[in-house]
Amino acid sequence: MILNLIILLAISIVASASNIAAYWGQNAGGDQQTLGDYCSSSPASIIILSFLDGFPNLSLNFANQCSGTFSSGLAHCSQIGSDIKSCQQQGKTILLSLGGATGNYGFSSDSEAVQFAGTLWNKFGGGKDSERPFDDAIVDGFDFDIENKDQTGYAALATQLRKYFSTGTKSYYLSAAPQCPYPDESVGDLMSQVDLDFAFIQFYNNYCSLNQQFNWNSWSNYARGKSIKLYLGLPGSSSSAGSGFVGLSTVQRVVASIKGDSSFGGISIWDISSAENGGYLNQLHQALSGSGSPAAPSNSYQPNTPLTRTYGGSTATASAYISVGFTAGATHGSTTTNDLLAWIDSLFGSSQSSVQQYATPVQSVTATPQPVAATTTSAPKPTASAFNWFGWFDGTTTSTTLQTVYSTVPADQTVYVTLTTTVGSQMLQSLFDKRDVIAEAKSTNLQICWLLFIPLLALICS
């Protein structure tokens, strides 16, 4: 009874909602360091070794981190074994993941899977074997990252492992890494038939990622009445997954919406080598702990950001997707012909107000709806309906300031705004639309007497 209480307490500590679980071993970031380095420097409390990618005929793959072998050809990773013990001394939980997106693995029957449970226990757990890839280091459990849609034997394997765990003197854990569509096609049976401790749900490379049809509620309903903790699985960078990488502000928003769920355990990352680059892992840790402020990538903006421009003395505001080419908080100036027009007008006895009376300010500015797929082509160059006079005259400068906003689209996507400007005149009763044109109302107010000034100007210049 006391042992069971200790195990439950250990699980509750490991499954704290501020936890980060990180996969290590496949070098997704391109500069993978040793397991010990990440245990010492990262906030991850659970690190999953990936992968045992071949079974029942054993095969291990840790990219650039293990080159030794036994005489049988099985990988012998003494440094990883030493790091496992060091990590555990620092309070880290170390799991060994079975499967992966590629590999030669699977069972022909439940009986074969039950037999393989003994192999796992003896080579990586509390059992004994002459060839232990991590020497005397003992992992804290096993993760099922099965992705080949063959579910044969995994429930039987997990059930048998639980029996071995009960004979040990420490806490052991079982986890799964399902894709976010529910139920998962590769570990759905395992998750419905066996009590697991964690689920590192892959909310990427699918339609149910955080910035699409996020389906946390489906998984929360599955976890109801169970002791399992659900992790928000994210890619560590845009290059470590085909799709689904999101900025910190999106993560903060989602975490705020689900952190009250008793089944929420934290965030899981694929993988730690990519998430360490740029400090993303530490930012996620701050998001979970509630500290820190939203990051504002300089080349990405969220939708529905107010955009205000002033035309002919009137101001129009619209909500739009802003081109990633802008910089938050920057001021962009443009030269107008207001002073020039006023000066010419005064030569003929007209006042500024007489010019202004013909100007109908912009009536509406509308934004193009969010595109289904962000464009990656160059931004269209808008044309202007007013002359800039090559800076010869002392024109006034109007400016537009974009407020600082936070990203809800991946930084590597480019989104453009299309403004529809309606310009009217008392001399033209019908209204007309112009797309991709930012027009100044002054440009519609050219009085016929000004045409006399053009030959005079040409004569002076000659």
Curated annotation (Swiss-Prot):
Protein keywords: Carbohydrate metabolism, Chitin degradation, Chitin-binding, Glycoprotein, Glycosidase, Hydrolase, Polysaccharide degradation, Secreted, Signal
Enzyme class: hydrolase
GO CC terms, sorted: cellular bud neck; extracellular region; fungal-type cell wall
Primary residence: secreted
SUPFAM superfamilies: (Trans)glycosidases (SSF51445)
PROSITE patterns in the record: GH18_1, GH18_2
Organism superkingdom: Eukaryota
Organism: Candida albicans (strain SC5314 / ATCC MYA-2876)
Catalytic activity reported: Random endo-hydrolysis of N-acetyl-beta-D-glucosaminide (1->4)-beta-linkages in chitin and chitodextrins
Stated name of the protein: Chitinase 1
Signal peptide: 1-17
Gene Ontology terms for molecular function: chitin binding; chitinase activity; endochitinase activity
EC code: 3.2.1.14
Single GO BP term: filamentous growth
Keyword Nucleus annotated: no
Disulfide linkage: none
InterPro entries: Cts1-like, Glyco_hydro18_cat, Glyco_hydro_18_chit_AS, Glycoside_hydrolase_SF, Glycosyl_Hydrlase18_Chitinase
Family named by the database record: Belongs to the glycosyl hydrolase 18 family. Chitinase class V subfamily.
Glycan-carrying positions: 57
Stretches assigned to the GH18 domain: 18-291
